[in-house]
Amino acid sequence: MINLLSAATSVPKTVFRTSELVGSLMHKLSPELINTIGTLGVDQRYSVLDNYPEFLAGKPTRATSSTTELGVEATERCIHEWGGDPNRIGLLVAATNTPDQMLPCLASEIMGKTHGLLSRSLRTVSMQAQGCSVLLKSIEVAQW
């Protein structure tokens, strides 16, 4: 029997409201697009860019974290909250829509940056660029 032992996420520290996003781009968006964004039901967003709405308007910015850093943080949190022996883990599923790079994949990068926390014989799956359904697909893959 296959058991899902634990799951965790990590999000960037920079938080902004959708209204800020629309406000900073008001002069560049059509009324139809503004209406569509307003009806999505997403009030709060996260970004690795410390000034994301202004960045879209052309102001320079810098990244506050990388997808790999967030993945390592989530992996460490996942193992800590589970509280079990990391050697019992048989599969690492890493999911993102915004990888730092295409290759090596996110799961491989996490394995390399967890400094021996995970077994080198651990199987890995990286799920990238799959849209909103990536969370559900990740759980499905983990239970397969």
Regions found by a protein language model. Give the residues of each.
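Short glycine-rich or small-residue beta-strand-to-loop segments that form or flank ligand, phosphate
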Residues: G90-T98
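Conserved active-site "lid/cap" helical segment
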Residues: I2-G90
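Conserved catalytic cysteine-centered active-site region
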Residues: L40-S47, S65, N97-W144
